[in-house]
Amino acid sequence: MLRWVREITGWMVWIPDKARYAGIRETSGCGLGGSPLWEI
């Protein structure tokens, strides 16, 4: 359960951060976090 909470909290920070680098990192999306949410 703690791991799940930590991942959700991490996404709150990672999603906006990834969105900023979308143009650069989209070619290697799975390289950073590989989160399923970002794949959508």
Curated annotation (Swiss-Prot):
It comes from Leptolyngbya boryana (Plectonema boryanum). Keywords: Plasmid. This is Uncharacterized 4.6 kDa protein.
